[in-house]
Regions:
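Glycine-rich beta->alpha junctions and the first turn(s) of the following alpha-helix
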Residues: 2-9, 173-266, 325
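Glycine-rich phosphate/cofactor-binding loops in nucleotide/flavin-utilizing enzymes
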Residues: 2, 68, 89, 304-351
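A short, Trp-centered hydrophobic/proline-enriched beta-strand micro-motif
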Residues: 109-122, 155
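C-terminal helix-coil-helix/basic helical segment that borders enzyme active sites and/or dimer interfaces
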Residues: 21-32, 239, 243-246, 262-291, ...
């Protein structure tokens, strides 16, 4: 795609998000991301953004996909996370296996709602799922599944082959967990007793972890969108909120702080979207963007004062989502270990 095409894509995604996502952002937070909204995302090609066209997807390149994620996250990080799960976790695992490729068409059209059991591979956890294969049954429990309302899931079985399983039914929620952020997506524990499953490959945990590591630039894009959405609200609020007969923007601590954050946003974006990245550069983009999102959303919340904690102002969700997203999609210590291995050409930073 040419530069002009990327600009046109950004403009069209932003227009769609503002019209169809931002207008129901509070509803998404309160009631979750509806099937209707998912179909709306699919109608624009977002649910299959990285799925090849031969399997019903849009087949966007890396930069175009990042633009989609960033612009959706400006309005609803939950919507961006739903697209991320479909395109950067679920679909790559299916494509790599070469099996059940037909399901990708249903993912792209939002006929199928998907999830991947990846939370056990996050920092502070060390486990496979509790799913075992007994004959023609897959049985057990999956704890802390993001998008737990999915009808099709991928899990790594707790067996000698650590099989990667595609499970299309025979499971249900046994517990819905409270969540700090990404409230548009269900966060649940599932009980599985299914005969409707397929072994995609062996070494499932390793493959899921590799997919997580491959999301460096995508995670950076979502984090940038979260930061940009929060800062936009803070800048606009500082223009209209008066104190001592002056708008907040007239005061140096507010104006200087927001200006520096806006400038830093552009620096992080320029780096994340550069044409060529080394492996180390991708990790840096992820770490910097995630850290920036947490800092920027915190400052945006402070600019709003007490009003920032009211849901109707729409800024507190960005702070919550920045924190939740960093926990669910960024593994700081492991990311830094990967970076150190790239720099030192050997295992480093493990003591």
């Amino acid at each position: 795609m040419m530069a002009e095409e990327y600009q046109l894509l950004r403009s069209s995604v932003r227009e769609f998000a503002q019209k169809n996502i931002d207008s129901i952002a509070v509803k998404i937070e309160q009631e979750g991301l509806s099937s209707e909204t998912a179909r709306s995302l699919a109608s624009q090609g977002f649910m299959g953004a990285r799925i090849p066209a031969e399997y019903g997807g849009t087949g966007l390149d890396q930069r175009g996909y990042m633009i989609v994620l960033e612009e959706l996250a400006r309005c609803s990080p939950s919507a961006a996370a739903r697209v991320l799960i479909a395109n950067s976790l679920f679909s790559p695992l299916v494509l790599a296996s070469g099996k059940s490729m037909e399901i990708l068409r249903d993912v792209a059209s939002a006929k199928t709602n998907v999830a991947v059991d990846h939370c056990g591979l996050l920092e502070g956890h060390s486990r496979n799922s509790g799913v075992v294969i007994e004959g023609n049954h897959a049985q057990g429990r999956v704890d802390y599944l993001l998008n737990g309302g999915a009808d099709t899931i991928i899990v790594a079985a707790d067996d000698p082959q650590n099989a990667l399983l595609l499970v299309r039914g025979g499971f249900g929620r046994v517990e819905v967990h409270p969540r700090l952020g990404l409230r548009g997506l269900d966060f649940s524990s599932l009980a599985i007793d299914s005969t409707n499953f397929e072994r995609l490959s062996e070494n499932g945990s390793r493959l899921i972890e590799a997919a997580i590591n491959d999301m460096d630039l995508e995670v950076a894009a979502v984090s940038l969108g979260i930061a940009a959405g929060a800062l936009s609200k803070a800048v606009e609020y500082s223009k209209v909120r008066n104190t001592f007969e002056h708008p907040l923007k007239d005061y140096q601590p507010v104006a200087f702080g927001l200006s520096l954050l806006r400038a830093e946003e552009e620096m992080v974006r320029d780096f994340a979207y550069k044409e060529h990245h080394t492996a180390a550069g991708k990790v840096v983009a992820r770490v910097r963007a995630v850290t920036f999102a947490k800092n920027a959303t915190n400052q945006a919340l402070q600019v709003h004062g007490g009003y920032g904690y009211f849901e109707d102002f729409g800024v507190e969700k960005f702070y919550r989502d920045a924190m939740a997203f960093s926990v669910l999609f960024s593994r700081t210590m492991k990311d830094m270990e990967r970076l150190s291995e790239q720099i030192f050409d050997s295992k480093a930073g493990f003591l």
